[in-house]
Amino acid sequence: MSGHSKFANIKHKKEKNDAKKGKIFTIIGREIVMAVKAGGPDPNNNGKLRDVIAKAQANNMPNDTIERGIKKAAGADSADSYEKAVYEGYGPNGVAIIVETLTDNKNRTASNVRNAFTKGNGSIGTQGCVSYMFDQKGQIIIDKEECEMDADELMMTALDAGAEDFNEEEDSYEVLTAPDDLGAVREALEAAGVPLLEAQVAMIPQTTVELTDEKSLKDIQRILDLLDDDDDVTDVWHNWDE
C-alpha cells in the first residue's frame, strides 16, 4: 500500500504565507464555533473539536487564541452562527469541483462562488452533479520530517488501527480511512506519538482529468485562486491532475 499516491495534489492546498494565514485562522475560528455548538467545549468528549484543534496547532495558531475561541463559542451569549454550504460545478474540460463553505450569509457566498466559476469559464451545477465522482474518506496527513517512525512502522500502526490505505509522498505520509473510522485512527496515531498535520474528511476523486492547453490551465487556476481568496470557502476538492 505504500508508495507514490495517485491522490497526491488532489486537494487544492492553501499556501501558509502571511497573506493566507489570516484566512486560515478565520476558517479555523468558524470551525471551532461549529464544533463547540454541535458537541460542546470539551475536546475529550468532542472528536470534531479535537480535529479542529489539531488543525489549528498544525497551522501555528496560538493556544490562547484557540482557548478564547472555544470559550467564546461556549458562552450563553454567543451570537456567532455559521452554516455549512456545499457547491458543485465544472471547470474547463469538465474538471469536477466541490466547494465547501462556512458562512453567515449564504446569498453572499453563493454569489461569490458562482462568480469564481464564471470568471474561469466554468459553471455551477446542481447538488450531486459531481459528488458521485468522489469517494468520501478520512484523510490524515503526517509530516515526514516531524515523524520519528519509518514508513513501514507508521503504515502498520495506521492499518492496525483500522486505516484503509497508506501512501508515501515526497515530504509527507497520507493515511486514508472510512469516514467513521477517522477519529479512532487519529487517536491511535496520536497515542503512538505521531505528529499530525491534518485530520479531516476529504473528497477523493475516483479518476482525474489532465489539462494540457494553456487556456484551460489558466482558467482552472483562476477558479481555484478566486475560491482560495474567499474567506467563506473552507475546502476545494477537484479531479484536476495537477
Model segments located where?
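N-terminal cationic and glycine-rich segments that engage phosphates or anionic surfaces
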Residues: 1-125, 130-141, 181, 238
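Positively charged, low-complexity, intrinsically disordered RNA-binding extensions
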Residues: 139-242
